[in-house]
Design a protein with these regions (language model features):
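Walker A (P-loop) phosphate-binding motif
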Residues: 1-21, 26
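Conserved nucleotide-sensing/catalytic segment adjacent to the nucleotide-binding pocket
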Residues: 31-60
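Conserved helix/coil segment N-terminal to the catalytic DExD/H
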Residues: 63-70
Length: 348
């Protein structure tokens, strides 16, 4: 979204999100997806003083539930999907959905992924003008003739009688919905469809999201992704499977002091879609790593597929690299851009 706005509007754009905050091209460290209210207002002030005319902000469900963004008049809000996550905080999916829906009482236009039925929940009590995007007939901005390749996605985007072709150098089915949301935001801001598609065609991938790790001299592939929910793990493994000639190996864990309900679900998804499972740690925090792993294993049915357990993530990755064979695809899921492990209350 940031790239598209900069290319189409020739302006300076701020970014607030999980990976990093940016004021134009200057990186500002981030501690949480959406800062606390006071810090957020200070960051927005810095962006304005630096000449930013637009800000792309990732607004977490926590921030919405805790009123961190109350009073901010969003020009456009966007909805990607609603899948099980953060139930340690929200307790129920209904409460989680209701928290996300608050965004659409704060924005002028809501761009929503109509391929996820939860978009209807987002519009309950909404004060915005909705713009639906997707692959179905309900979408005002619709993807047709979608082509998935190992290194890109191509499709025709139709808006009424208008149509434009776009090729994006980021593989995966989820790129289709992400691209449509970006184009929907462009249209809500008055940017022409063809101009937005042209800009999107030059966008690069995001660090730690379906990122291929260079492995010189090796005949297997290593892929890093931030997938840490059942739905996200299903998406990345399904995408990786399309381009895997050998075995699909999944290295994953679940966060400690977080939603325990998704742990067996993650195990079940990995068991269904991967050929080899390596269950390890992913920010265990104050929980015992093996206790988390046991809850993941509870979701893995009796299977002839190899299932390895190694609570030390570094050792788990090294072990996987040793037994990987020609044409294997190794998916390191859960950490994405993170280069640390949270043990107890410390980042290691």
């Amino acid at each position: 979204i940031k790239h598209m706005l900069e290319q189409c509007l020739h302006t300076k754009v701020g970014l607030i999100g999980t990976i990093e905050n940016r004021i134009g091209d200057t990186v500002v460290p981030t501690e949480r997806t959406t800062p606390e209210s006071f810090a957020l207002q200070g960051l927005l002030r810095q962006m304005l003083d630096a000449g930013c005319t637009h800000v792309v902000m990732e607004v977490s469900s926590h921030a919405l539930a805790l009123h961190r963004v109350d009073g901010i008049p969003f020009t456009v809000g966007a909805f990607t999907n609603l899948t099980e996550d953060h139930l340690d905080f929200h307790k129920t999916m209904e409460a989680y959905g209701a928290a996300k829906a608050r965004l659409f009482r704060l924005c002028r236009t809501g761009v929503l992924n109509a391929d996820d039925p939860a978009y209807r929940t987002m519009l309950q009590g909404a004060a915005c003008t909705p713009l639906l995007v997707g692959t179905g007939k309900d979408a005002a901005l619709r993807a047709e003739q979608v082509q998935l390749a190992p290194d890109h996605v191509a499709m025709e985007v139709r808006e009424g009688e208008k149509a434009a072709h776009v090729r994006i150098g980021i593989p995966g089915r989820f790129t289709v919905s992400n691209a449509l949301l970006t184009l929907g935001i462009a249209r809500a801001l008055g940017i022409g469809l063809e101009d937005a598609c042209r800009a999107l065609g030059t966008a690069a991938g995001v660090k730690g999201r379906i990122e291929v790790v260079p492995t010189p001299g090796r005949d297997y592939t290593v892929l890093i992704d931030y997938a840490h929910t059942p739905d996200a793990l299903e998406n990345i493994l399904t995408t990786a499977r399309d381009f895997t000639a050998g075995r699909l190996i999944c290295v994953f864990g679940c966060g400690g002091d977080r939603d325990r309900g998704k742990r067996p679900l993650m195990g079940a998804v990995a068991a269904e879609l991967a050929d080899v499972l390596v269950v390890t740690s992913d920010n265990p925090r104050t929980e015992e790593p093996m206790a988390i792993i046991r809850e993941i294993l509870a979701g893995i049915p009796q299977t002839e597929k190899p299932v390895y357990v190694e609570k030390n993530r570094r050792r788990a990755i090294r072990m996987t690299l040793r037994f990987a064979q020609k044409d294997d695809m190794i998916v390191l899921a859960g950490k994405g851009h993170e280069t640390y492990q949270v043990l107890g209350t410390e980042k290691i």
